[in-house]
């Protein structure tokens, strides 16, 4: 492998592509399978791709709704009209996680139908909501949905397995285009592996098109993250061995985040670094710190120097956030 990752191979290419409007067009409402209807949230943008996907699941009069989008009029008007004309009732409203582009439509749903107030389910629920536990089953005609705890993108993140299709509603853990972000990278990686172990064939993401080869997409996500860890650790290790003297003296040869970007990827536009790279790479550095592979020199966060730990140090040094 070369010492640097080519610009075109990394996730920010799709990040920028999405901002430029090159994503495939998705219908506002579409039957993506016999038992799944996707309704867009009406909130397209660089962070939401074509908008938040919400899903009606089931084949009978009673259905399950997964996520409620951002709370824009376009979504509540669209789903209310569809439910009314098709004479469909909601038995459960399942929320993948707490982020506003997934929970924002809850008040509108309740305002349209007050009986839904006691049908809202979320892991670590807000006041008035019901809890979701790992393995919990939600059933309606044509759909048996099992809750899967998958934290990392957020602390409360849930995926939902549709047993009739061997399909997984992936929430924000895996997107239809590009790569997601993680609040806790270590737990996120564990969740990706847990998702892969389920053996689901297809994925219904919270943003982007249906994933027709979910095992392949999950492998791509895992390899992408692990590859970045290896590249960053390699860059820090190469830099460390150039130092001489005691350990304290070698710490002076650490790299700042911008220097790591330069070492791994070469020169990039500052906008790409700040908006698409820095948050993700900092997550990698903290994970490597927690894994006792990397340490850092305390100080100004913007100028903080990171360094690879030698093997003998890894059993003695614990990284701590500061």
From Swiss-Prot:
- List ligand-binding residues for Zn(2+) 2: 101-102
Give the record's GO biological process terms: antibiotic catabolic process; secondary metabolite biosynthetic process
Name its co-factor(s). Answer: Zn(2+)
Q: Which family does it belong to?
A: Belongs to the metallo-beta-lactamase superfamily.
Q: List the Pfam families hit by this protein, alphabetically.
A: Lactamase_B
> Could you tell me the gene encoding this protein?
nscB
E.C. number, please?
Answer: 3.1.-.-
What pathway is this protein a component of? Secondary metabolite biosynthesis
Q: How is the cofactor bound?
A: Binds 2 Zn(2+) ions per subunit.
User: What functional role does this protein have?
Assistant: Lactamase-like protein; part of the gene cluster that mediates the biosynthesis of neosartoricin B, a prenylated anthracenone that probably exhibits T-cell antiproliferative activity, suggestive of a physiological role as an immunosuppressive agent. The non-reducing polyketide synthase nscA probably synthesizes and cyclizes the decaketide backbone. The hydrolase nscB then mediates the product release through hydrolysis followed by spontaneous decarboxylation. The prenyltransferase nscD catalyzes the addition of the dimethylallyl group to the aromatic C5.
What domain of life is recorded for the organism? Eukaryota
Sites where the protein binds Zn(2+) 1: 97, 99
Q: Which Gene3D superfamilies match?
A: Ribonuclease Z/Hydroxyacylglutathione hydrolase-like, Winged helix-like DNA-binding domain superfamily/Winged helix DNA-binding domain
Where does this protein come from, organism-wise? Answer: Trichophyton rubrum (strain ATCC MYA-4607 / CBS 118892)
| Catalytic residues as annotated in Swiss-Prot or TrEMBL | 101
Q: Extract the InterPro entries matched here.
A: Beta-lactamase_class-B_CS (IPR001018), LACTB2-like_MBL-fold (IPR047921), Metallo-B-lactamas (IPR001279), RibonucZ/Hydroxyglut_hydro (IPR036866), Sec-metab_biosynth-thioest (IPR050662), WH-like_DNA-bd_sf (IPR036388)
MF GO annotations = beta-lactamase activity; zinc ion binding
Q: What is this protein called?
A: Lactamase-like protein nscB
Q: Report keywords, A-Z.
A: Hydrolase, Metal-binding, Zinc
**Which top class of enzyme applies to this chain?**
hydrolase
């Amino acid at each position: 492998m070369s010492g640097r990752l080519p610009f075109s191979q990394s996730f920010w290419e799709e990040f920028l592509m999405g901002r430029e409007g090159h994503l495939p067009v998705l219908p506002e409402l579409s039957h993506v399978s016999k038992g799944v209807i996707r309704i867009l949230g009406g909130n397209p943008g660089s962070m939401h791709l074509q908008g938040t996907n919400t899903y009606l699941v089931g084949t009978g009069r009673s259905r399950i709704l997964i996520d409620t989008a951002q709370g824009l009029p376009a979504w509540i008007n669209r789903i209310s009209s569809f439910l009314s004309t098709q004479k469909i009732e909601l038995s459960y409203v399942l929320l993948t996680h707490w982020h506003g582009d997934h929970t924002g439509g809850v008040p509108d749903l309740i305002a349209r139908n007050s009986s839904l107030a006691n049908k809202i389910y979320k892991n670590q629920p807000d006041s008035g909501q019901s809890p979701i536990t790992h393995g919990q089953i939600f059933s309606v005609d044509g759909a048996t949905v099992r809750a899967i705890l998958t934290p990392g993108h957020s602390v409360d993140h849930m995926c939902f397995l549709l047993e009739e299709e061997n399909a997984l509603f992936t929430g924000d853990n895996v997107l239809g285009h590009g790569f997601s972000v993680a609040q806790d990278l270590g737990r996120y990686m564990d969740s990706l592996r847990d998702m892969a172990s389920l053996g689901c064939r297809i994925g219904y993401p919270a943003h982007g098109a249906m994933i027709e080869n979910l095992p392949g997409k999950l492998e791509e996500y895992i390899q992408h993250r692990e590859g970045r860890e290896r590249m960053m650790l390699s860059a820090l290790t190469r830099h460390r061995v150039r130092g001489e003297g005691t350990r304290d003296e070698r710490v002076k040869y650490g790299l700042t985040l911008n220097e790591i970007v330069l070492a791994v990827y070469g020169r990039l536009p500052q906008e790409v670094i700040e908006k698409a790279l820095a948050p993700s790479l900092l997550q990698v550095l903290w994970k490597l710190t927690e894994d006792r592979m990397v340490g850092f020199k305390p100080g100004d966060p913007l100028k903080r120097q990171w360094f690879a730990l030698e093997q003998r140090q890894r059993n003695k040094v614990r990284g701590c956030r500061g």
